[in-house]
């Protein structure tokens, strides 16, 4: 951690949340940012701060996305044989932002991010092996019908590598 303590990190991060539109974090990062590892509570606390979208990465249980307009979805991960999880979170974030900048629905952004993260996790290298758009699209096409294809509602969902996504 870059901070002296978890408490110091929370002190420094909390005021910044008032200027944030979208937050992405795993359970540990949510604990630091808003004081809870519970994904639904973390999303509620982030949205209560005025964010438009909260994305909580749930490791092997996928990703939960919640929006200020009341939408809440859990998107399952794509199962892959993990070779090295390093960089999968960066791939998720980059692919998620690609989707946002392309005007996609939040669930599609998460699904695309999950695919990119899964691709990187299935490879030995991380920075040198970031997937291209064509690779992510091919991955998604090969897995049409896989659990990661369709989001499930938070009410029916069971709860990628948490610390690496």
Roles of regions detected by a PLM:
Residues 37-165:
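Conserved phosphate-binding/catalytic region of the ribokinase-like
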Residues 1-45, 61-63:
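Conserved beta-alpha-beta core of the PfkB/ribokinase-like small-molecule kinase fold
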